[in-house]
Amino acid sequence: MFDFSGPKYTVNLFVPCHMDLFLPYGVQPVLSLLQKMGDVPYYNSELTCCGRQFLLRGEIDTAQELAFRLVRHFDNGYPIVCPSSDCIGYLKKYAKNLCQHSGVPAAVAHVVQDSYELCDYIVNKKHVECLNNTFNHKVFYFRSCSARNIYPSDDAMTLLKNTKGLELVTDPEMKLCCCGNGDFALHNGELTDLMLKKIVDRIKTFDVEFVTSSDLHCLQYLDAYIATRNDVNLNVVPIAEILNSEK
């Protein structure tokens, strides 16, 4: 178990593996946001995998082991915040079944019921809809599959709309998937590229400077694809950076 002696923590911060491995600097804006709202976040850099990719590959035993590890370490009464809707949506949907034989039903219920994507936590747990942040750019918000289906929420758009200087662009008709399932992309490269092309080409028509999302995995796929296109002048930015921005 983790050592919770010392500071009086108020929230657990769970950083998913795709942020820890490919976007480690992205943790700081999240920590800063939580601290600005008066929270004292507990963050353990060794706890970085929800097990989603293993379950998608059919590796049930590993998925169960990782889910139980999260349940065990977050059994401390504090809410759990994750800056990516795919991971938190996965935990809410699958943790109960994966940990049904864990022998700690109360701890499992805590993870399922008291886990939040970052924007959801800010709006619905802290009851804050305006962070007094500034981001003087035109931004497209990509609502990923996890944000539409697994973890439906408009909280990200609420916070973006209340960002000073930000011109928000959305597309309710966009129902495309970014293929943020690593196993699918690995075995279906051409189809993945085609779907990403359709997304990026559509976003390009809005003449925006940035694209953001509450789903970090999707942002990484979009960023990697955009890097292959010389005709696309589009920057990918995690939503926490926008919400923590002062310029």
Tell what function each PLM region has.
Residues M1-K247:
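Iron-sulfur cluster-binding electron-transfer modules in prokaryotic oxidoreductases
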